[in-house]
Amino acid sequence: MLPFWIALQFLSSLPVRLPGMPTPNEMGRSLLFYPVVGLLFGLLLWLASHLLQGAPAPLHAALLLALWVLLSGALHLDGLADSADAWLGGFGDRERTLQIMKDPRSGPIAVVVLVLVLLLKFCALWVLVERGTGGWLVLAPVVGRAAMLGLFMGTPYVRKGGLGAALAEHLPRRAAGWVLLGSVLGCVVLGGSPGLWMLLLSLGVFLWLRRLMCKRLGGTTGDTAGAMVELLELAVLVGLALMV
């Protein structure tokens, strides 16, 4: 179970303590549990939504979004901000794009992108809450983190050394394929027909984002992987909100 605790510590702000420094093999296996962490987030959001029944829909949605950000420690939002700055500031140049991603400061483009993504998530949550489909909240965190597993499974990691390189190098790919299949089937069971359409939409967004990464960088980084999580969660929420 150590790989699960590694995944939970890395992807969440929950107080998880590991018994020692994980080995590279344990780090790679932790990727297999990313969809499980997404499922945990989704269940916590669903429980919170159930407890907030009766609250005004805008406040209900805002509190869910705040909990969502707190659970992840804004980890993927940080990656989205860095990627937005780098993508527009890099002017198509690979090395310049990678250099800007290392800058901890956020420019106006990053701020605008974050505001837009959070605003769209809030509006989508509002619709889902108002129409009594809060149970579908489980789907978005699962899809986002399963996509990260899929990205590391089939995309080169462009930075040598560090956490991301260890994850990509030591990921057991056959097991990862089974985990992805289980995640897809689970989303279909939970979401029914809308869940299936949502998966097709997510696949399209995933392939498009991966193509952009490979064209610009020749692969992925931790920041672009985080950006993918946020954008896929957004696609799922908006897609479901439009279907209900």
Swiss-Prot record:
Coiled coil: none annotated. It is found in: Cell inner membrane. Pfam families: CobS. Its EC number is 2.7.8.26. The keyword Transport does not apply. GO terms for biological process: cobalamin biosynthetic process. Keywords: Cell inner membrane, Cell membrane, Cobalamin biosynthesis, Magnesium, Membrane, Transferase, Transmembrane, Transmembrane helix. Its cofactor is Mg(2+). It catalyses: alpha-ribazole + adenosylcob(III)inamide-GDP = adenosylcob(III)alamin + GMP + H(+); alpha-ribazole 5'-phosphate + adenosylcob(III)inamide-GDP = adenosylcob(III)alamin 5'-phosphate + GMP + H(+). It is a multi-pass membrane protein. The chain crosses the membrane at residues 31-51, 55-75, 109-129, 134-154, 188-208. InterPro entries: CobS (IPR003805). GO terms for cellular component: plasma membrane. Its main location: membrane. Pathway: Cofactor biosynthesis; adenosylcobalamin biosynthesis; adenosylcobalamin from cob(II)yrinate a,c-diamide: step 7/7. The keyword rRNA-binding does not apply. PANTHER family: ADENOSYLCOBINAMIDE-GDP RIBAZOLETRANSFERASE. Belongs to the CobS family. Joins adenosylcobinamide-GDP and alpha-ribazole to generate adenosylcobalamin (Ado-cobalamin). Also synthesizes adenosylcobalamin 5'-phosphate from adenosylcobinamide-GDP and alpha-ribazole 5'-phosphate. This is Adenosylcobinamide-GDP ribazoletransferase. It comes from Pseudomonas entomophila (strain L48). The lineage of its organism: Bacteria, Pseudomonadati, Pseudomonadota, Gammaproteobacteria, Pseudomonadales.
